From Swiss-Prot:
Activity regulation field: Activated by tyrosine and threonine phosphorylation.
Residues the record lists as binding ATP: V29, G30, M31, G32, A33, F34, G35, L36, V37, K52
Localization terms from the record: Cytoplasm; Nucleus
Pfam family for this entry, one: Pkinase
Domain of life (superkingdom): Eukaryota
Name this polypeptide is given: Mitogen-activated protein kinase HOG1
Residue intervals of the Protein kinase domain: 23-302
Catalytic activity of the protein: L-seryl-[protein] + ATP = O-phospho-L-seryl-[protein] + ADP + H(+); L-threonyl-[protein] + ATP = O-phospho-L-threonyl-[protein] + ADP + H(+)
Record carries keyword Nucleotide-binding: yes
Catalytic residues (positions): D144
Length: 447
């Protein structure tokens, strides 16, 4: 079993970072979705990596599910223009760390330093759309595409990151998701019935920002955001208005004076015509009339880079069966640990479930594993209090506790009463042993 000596603790922005001794030279690089991100050196590969700490992933069932979703997505989505998961581990404090390649900068920082030359705008836009084609083919909507989620290295290789908000393609999706400047109008107008087209709108806003060096729709609030969109696109067409579900929103939109659109050729007079044409096809009020990522790649503007044989789609749709699940934290914990062990190609560990099984079967197995771990913890607590013979330990049904559990409990009670007493405080301490095993076996596997 892994021990704390395998981890190095340091304070980053007042937050404890606990990493295995495989990684060194930690430096903060920013905050990602729901976590702190640091750069580090991977001593096994001698390469620079980014380590994202997911803080308190098991604090609530909502946080556990969100972390599980991001882990599943990172395992499933493997593409040159998407951030790639290289390692994952759990710390003794039960925080989760995702390790990915380090890109150096992001598009937001790049745009703040200098205007982009035309060839870079073209190449970056191609890579964004190439990544989106793959993501959408997997049945996934990113939902939070913005310049700070577009990572770039010194070779101009671009990768989309932060899938913490990603969701299934679902015509009934609801919520308040992307950063305002890049938010599609259907989200503001309806708050539901949106799909992959929201990413195309966001990519169009990013495209315009790369061209002009400043945000296209810098709204101060929802009303102002909608107003400056209509300044360019004109009033939304009637078929879009008909999809508005909120009565208050409908009253607001229909109360506005009619606005005519400004031709994109006038708004972007100094921009090459092919770029203007593609931008106009991406920034359309009606999401169903917006160009797709696949069709955008074939647009004449991207002809210098377009290669239909090198713009792959996902081999399989992402499995979203867990999306509507309402499970307790301990069940999510077991499922998460099992996914981590599977990532490291480790099998046969106590408490591990089969991640290739159907979701319902995984839930059933994880529920049993969580219950067994709780029983183990209660047995430890019972012995620490009563110092009874481990051979006398009984399950609730009257059957003897298995020998290995009893023996481990006895050893724990006789050699370290304080450690055994900790099991009484929380059954999750025992479940955390699965995490330590995951780290231990992963380290052995990588050496």
């Amino acid at each position: 079993m892994a021990t704390n000596e395998e981890f190095i603790r340091t304070q980053i922005f007042g937050t404890v970072f606990e990493i295995t001794n495989r990684y060194s030279d930690l430096n903060p690089v920013g905050m990602g979705a729901f976590g702190l991100v640091c750069s580090a050196t991977d001593t096994l590969t001698n390469q620079q990596v980014a380590i994202k700490k997911i803080m308190k992933p098991f604090a609530t069932a909502v946080l556990a599910k969100r972390t599980y979703r991001e882990l599943k997505l990172l395992k499933h989505l493997r593409h040159e223009n998407l951030i790639c998961l290289q390692d994952i581990f759990l710390s003794p404090l039960e925080d989760i760390y995702f390790v990915t390649e380090l890109q150096g900068t992001d598009l937001h920082r790049l745009l703040q330093t200098r205007p982009l030359e035309k060839q870079f705008v073209q190449y970056f836009h191609y890579q964004i759309l190439r990544g989106l084609k793959y993501v959408h083919s997997a049945g996934v909507v990113h939902r939070d595409l913005k310049p700070s989620n577009i990572l770039i290295n010194e070779n101009c290789d671009l990768k989309i990151c932060d899938f913490g908000l990603a969701r299934i393609q679902d015509p009934q999706m609801t919520g308040y998701v992307s950063t305002r400047y890049y938010r599609a109008p259907e989200i503001m107008l309806t708050w539901q019935k949106y799909d992959v087209e929201v990413d195309i709108w966001s990519a169009g806003c990013i495209f315009a920002e790369m061209i002009e060096g400043k945000p296209l729709f810098p709204g101060k609030d929802h009303v102002h955001q909608f107003s400056i969109i209509t300044d360019l696109l004109g009033s939304p067409p009637s078929d879009v208005i008909d999809t508005i579900c909120s009565e208050n929103t409908l009253k607001f939109v229909t109360s506005l004076p009619h606005r005519d659109p400004i031709p994109f050729s006038e708004r972007f007079k100094t921009v090459e015509p092919d770029a203007v044409d593609l931008l106009e096809k991406m920034l359309v009020f009606d999401p169903k009339k917006r160009i797709t990522a696949a069709d955008a790649l074939a647009h004449p503007y991207l002809a210098p880079y377009h290669d239909p044989t090198d713009e792959p789609v996902a081999e399989a749709k992402f499995d979203w069966h867990f999306n509507d699940a309402d499970l307790p934290v301990d069940t999510w914990r077991v499922m998460m640990y099992s996914e981590i062990l599977d990532f490291h190609k480790i099998g046969g560990t106590d408490g591990q479930i089969d991640t290739s099984a159907t979701f319902d079967d995984q839930v059933a197995a994880a529920t049993v594993a969580a219950a067994q771990a709780q029983a183990h913890a209660l047995a430890q607590a019972q012995m620490s209090q009563n110092m009874i013979d481990p051979n006398q330990l009984l399950n609730e049904d009257g059957t003897p506790v298995s020998g290995s559990i009893a023996e481990n409990s006895s050893n724990s009670a006789t050699t370290n009463l304080n450690g055994a007493a900790a099991g009484m405080n929380s059954a999750s301490d025992t479940i955390n042993e699965y995490a330590n095993q995951a780290v231990h076996f992963a380290n052995e596997f990588q050496q």
